[in-house]
Amino acid sequence: MAAVETRVCETDGCSSEAKLQCPTCIKLGIQGSYFCSQECFKGSWATHKLLHKKAKDEKAKREVCSWTVEGDVNTDPWAGYRYTGKLRPHYPLMPTRPVPSYIQRPDYADHPLGMSESEQALKGTSQIKLLSSEDIEGMRLVCRLAREVLDIAAGMIKAGVTTEEIDHAVHLACIARNCYPSPLNYYNFPKSCCTSVNEVICHGIPDRRPLQEGDIVNVDITLYRNGYHGDLNETFFVGDVDEGARKLVQTTYECLMQAIDAVKPGVRYRELGNIIQKHAQANGFSVVRSYCGHGIHKLFHTAPNVPHYAKNKAVGVMKSGHVFTIEPMICEGGWQDETWPDGWTAVTRDGKRSAQFEHTLLVTDTGCEILTRRLDSSRPHFMSQF
């Protein structure tokens, strides 16, 4: 704590002279917060820390309250590009949202290319980290917070809401939880979450397009807290959807859960793709091959690589203490994909719809723990939309 001029202690019932001020209050610009001793400061901590959260929330709101959108919506920013489906980008994008300086940041957050040097240092290795008990507690916390943020996004899904508005809410929710939104500036990704509508497979960039009745939309959330990343996503219905969308989304979720049921020590990672593809094909769908699940902990993406298609050559055997994601992307038509000129938005080559679900998992001695599970329900949100 920093030494300052003498004041009266702010602890209830104490009128002693106060010579110490809370260092966090100084950083956040909170006036007052003087205490006579460390003991009084610690005794007031339960209520005093609420001032910090309030100040952080207000600061974050001030940073975004003046944002405006200028100019008309441009739905064809890439002259000559032949879209595979009906979806179009809605430009211009809002400016990159700032993250307050008091939020701990991953190594790529301020890199000009968004490059994670810690990930690059391990690129090509197939060695899978065994998490310590401390690591596991860190993962449990960040995954629980990531689930809270996805649940906030879920409550916004309706016709007329833009994916930009969802991203805004996600960004503020991350900051309110003292978390960095992991996608932001990861290899220069411009937003705080991914929103993938209809034929978008993954990595859709939130923009000004309003969601429309009958859409399906995936929201992919990752948070960074205390050095750990937590990652999950769900696909949602926008209003009333057709039977094809219902079957696609239901099957995709079943693919994920059947794969999770197989997770336990001794299982080869490559086996998960066999389980997923068998169920997808039995329902008339295909499995995306270009994007995979991944290890996650202090690194956003690391070993193991977890393909979702059959007869893959993934390396590694599950052991207690491994943490990784399973996130199958299932398509109505063919599995082939291409990427929009923005360098991120992956779409089906035939323009048909794709759905995805994701959980972060901890391998335990007897099976696995779903770190990103819903705490208030065992069902994904789309089941409540039927």
Swiss-Prot record:
Record InterPro entries: Creatinase/aminopeptidase-like (IPR036005), Pept_M24 (IPR000994), Pept_M24_MAP (IPR001714), Pept_M24A_MAP1 (IPR002467), Zfn-C6H2 (IPR031615)
What does the record's cofactor remark say about binding?
Binds 2 divalent metal cations per subunit. Has a high-affinity and a low affinity metal-binding site. The true nature of the physiological cofactor is under debate. The enzyme is active with zinc, cobalt, manganese or divalent iron ions. Has high activity with zinc; zinc cofactor is transferred into the active site region by the ZNG1 zinc chaperone.
Organism from which the protein derives: Mus musculus (Mouse)
Description of how the protein assembles with itself and partners = Associates with the 60S ribosomal subunit of the 80S translational complex.
Q: Which reaction does it catalyse?
A: Release of N-terminal amino acids, preferentially methionine, from peptides and arylamides
> Mind telling me what this protein is named?
Methionine aminopeptidase 1
Q: Which residues does a protein bind?
A: 203, 301
Residues that hold Zn(2+) 3 according to the record: 220, 231, 358
Q: Where does Zn(2+) 1 bind?
A: 9, 14, 36, 40
> Where is the protein localized?
Cytoplasm
Matching NCBIfam families, A to Z? met_pdase_I (TIGR00500)
The stretches annotated as zinc fingers (C6H2-type) lie at: 6-59
Q: PANTHER family, alphabetically?
A: METHIONINE AMINOPEPTIDASE (PTHR43330), METHIONINE AMINOPEPTIDASE 1 (PTHR43330:SF7)
What domain comment accompanies this record? Answer: The C6H2-type zinc finger recruits ZNG1, promoting zinc cofactor transfer in the peptidase domain of METAP1.
Q: Which CDD domains match?
A: MetAP1
Q: Which Pfam families match?
A: Peptidase_M24, zf-C6H2
What are the protein's UniProt keywords? Answer: Acetylation, Aminopeptidase, Cytoplasm, Hydrolase, Metal-binding, Protease, Zinc, Zinc-finger
Q: Cellular component GO terms, alphabetically? A: cytosolic ribosome
| Listed EC numbers | 3.4.11.18
